[in-house]
Every structure is written in structure tokens, then in C-alpha cells.
Amino acid sequence: MRIIGLDVGSKTVGVAVSDPLGFTAQGLEIIPINEAKGEFGFDRLADLVKDYKVEKFVVGLPKNMNNTSGPRVEASQAYGKKIKELFDLPVEYQDERLTTVQAERMLVEQADVSRGKRKKVIDKLAAQLILQNYLDRMF
């Protein structure tokens, strides 16, 4: 069963997909969105759902360190609700605290990636971490 993991931001959505057995997550791409214009990348997401035969979504929930809802929690939940309606697939939420920080650290310390290049992959890597954390919790 393939699962798509999403890191929903205000300008981009990082996308990751699980392997067919649901053990590992791989970063796929970053979908540009524009909340102000109501552009949320659902057409591209539909292509990915079809191509990978996805059966579930996992959306990162950006909670605060004290476990309260952060400013983006509502937006992430609204995105999750919309994809549930559009694709009629289950949507689960995964705490994403510090995934972007973890992704940034990995890119700097382990891969020595420049700031400009980090911006191009950070959301995809964060989505991968969100999905991998979910998969690890499930197995």
C-alpha cells in the first residue's frame, strides 16, 4: 500500500511517497501553491495518486513545542480535509515538529548543500521525514 506524505506550507507542498510495502519514504517533489489565489496543486497531486496507486495521505501537522496548535495547523487540516474530499482516500496527520529543522541540519551537516540548493529540496525532505516518522510509528 503506497502512502503519500505532505509537508504543507503557504507557498509549496513537499511530497514524499512510501515504497509499496510501506517501510520507507522517498522524497518526490515540491509542488508550488498560492494560497492567496486558491492554487493548491491538486491537479499535480491527482497525477501522483494515479501514478503511484496511492491509498492514503499523511499530512504533517506543525504543532508548537508545547504541543499546542501552531499557526499553520488549521491550514494543514483544511488541506487534508480538501484532499480527503477530492480523492476519497483516508487522511492521517503526523506531528511534524522540528522536521524542517532536522531536514535543514541534514542538508548542511551531512550533505554540505548550499543555502540556494537547500531551498529547492527542504520541503521534499521534510515531507520524507514526516512520512518516515509515520511509517516507523505504524510498524
UniProtKB/Swiss-Prot annotation:
Q: What is its main location?
A: cytoplasm
Q: Listed disulfide bonds for this chain? A: none
GO CC terms, sorted: cytosol
Q: Which GO terms describe its molecular function?
A: nuclease activity
Q: Which CDD domains match?
A: YqgF
Q: Does the keyword Hydrolase apply?
A: yes
Q: Which SUPFAM superfamilies match?
A: Ribonuclease H-like
Keyword vocabulary terms for this entry: Cytoplasm, Hydrolase, Nuclease, Ribosome biogenesis
Q: Does the keyword Hydrolase apply?
A: yes
The EC code for this enzyme is 3.1.-.-
Report the InterPro entries cross-referenced here: RNaseH-like_sf, YqgF, YqgF/RNaseH-like_dom, YqgF/RNaseH-like_dom_sf
GO terms classed as biological process? rRNA 5'-end processing
Please give the HAMAP family that the UniProt record associates with this protein.
Nuclease_YqgF
**Function per UniProt:** Could be a nuclease involved in processing of the 5'-end of pre-16S rRNA.
For this chain, the family text in UniProt reads: Belongs to the YqgF nuclease family.
PANTHER family xref list? POLYNUCLEOTIDYL TRANSFERASE, RIBONUCLEASE H-LIKE SUPERFAMILY PROTEIN (PTHR33317:SF4)
| NCBIfam families reported in the protein's UniProt record | RNAse_H_YqgF (TIGR00250)
Q: What is this protein called?
A: Putative pre-16S rRNA nuclease
What organism is recorded for this protein? Streptococcus mutans serotype c (strain ATCC 700610 / UA159)
